[in-house]
């Protein structure tokens, strides 16, 4: 019987197996940020250990930093975490993309764009959405702080091998429907626990048609379905994306041959298989307090089925049977490790070009990295957004989470391109609706959700 992509990735990295069936995996890349690393570095210090492979470790500032005045950090804990990361990286000789550095940005944006993320690698980070890197045919997953310390000290991690789930995406996406809508559809249909104990492998016609940035969006939210990771077999698009980037392999052609072996064999069998025809998908909007509480834009909000629905409706200030078009939007956030890359900003700009943000709506665009920001400005996207009434910010996690100055006031609704809509995720009492960049941009213009398939906007942008 053939092997799944998961099998090939796993077997290449097993160092040892213990009596409990756990495998010791070698870790090829360890990404670090300011929030989950301080205790891990302190653990090394207390035990007089060093970082085993600083050359396979890379740190950045992202979660806590302000995106308006990046040097004016007024929160005491945030400042302490940022200062501590600087000190730790200096002491342990770990490369750091600090505030103002041209390589700085959200950890799951800079990894791929710098060429750190590569097919065949095992990648870990003290962050839930490390699965993003699986879009390159890497086995990437989030870890806790004690595991961060273990990887820093040993460059290995004890893990139990997950099962393999194959998610086949058949057909061609309609105009106005994106990778974000696919994952929100999957979550709304199968729930937030469908992937528990699995690694999700996405494949099929729709995957082949996607660019790398859409694939990253898809894998980014595999964790929201309970999966250990999301992966996609690398192809020519993957290889072309990695080629020539700063940290890409110098012996690219020989490495590429090894990358080409990373696919699921035709006679391999998944532990669970899901087939989705994307041909008739619509834009999605979440209405509740987890990512599975979502509906098509042309559907009414569902009836209450249990206490969780009751609580979600109450928290969100919405009602069963309500039209999605009637959901008010006071804030719009285009950013996060899910949707802050150049193509995301291009799509959003194509929606708002020549138009104005609705009076009373606060709209932010937060590029995922300094390089994304510079590329967008080179194309004139910042002018399109600013002329429409958006705020153009510096890179960071921003309004994805209530951990920095960018927050949604209590009781107000935000159309967000991020990945989580939990209670208080964007600030105390904030009401978060997860959508694609196009849907978020359109909501900024109208002050409520609209069906972008029925709205007139440019499919391509003129940068003159």
Curated annotation (Swiss-Prot):
A Pfam family per the record: Aconitase
UniProt keyword annotations, A-Z: 4Fe-4S, Amino-acid biosynthesis, Branched-chain amino acid biosynthesis, Iron, Iron-sulfur, Leucine biosynthesis, Lyase, Metal-binding
Broad class of enzyme this protein falls into: lyase
InterPro entries cross-referenced by the UniProt entry: 3-IsopropMal_deHydase_lsu, Acnase/IPM_dHydase_lsu_aba_1/3, Acoase/IPM_deHydtase_lsu_aba, Aconitase_4Fe-4S_BS, Aconitase_4Fe-4S_dom, IPM_dehydratase_rel_enz, IPMI_cat
Reaction it catalyzes: (2R,3S)-3-isopropylmalate = (2S)-2-isopropylmalate
Residues annotated to bind [4Fe-4S] cluster: 337, 397, 400
HAMAP family reported for this sequence: LeuC_type1 (MF_01026)
Function, as annotated: Catalyzes the isomerization between 2-isopropylmalate and 3-isopropylmalate, via the formation of 2-isopropylmaleate.
Assembly with partners or alone: Heterodimer of LeuC and LeuD.
Name of protein: 3-isopropylmalate dehydratase large subunit
Organism of provenance: Bacillus cereus (strain ATCC 14579 / DSM 31 / CCUG 7414 / JCM 2152 / NBRC 15305 / NCIMB 9373 / NCTC 2599 / NRRL B-3711)
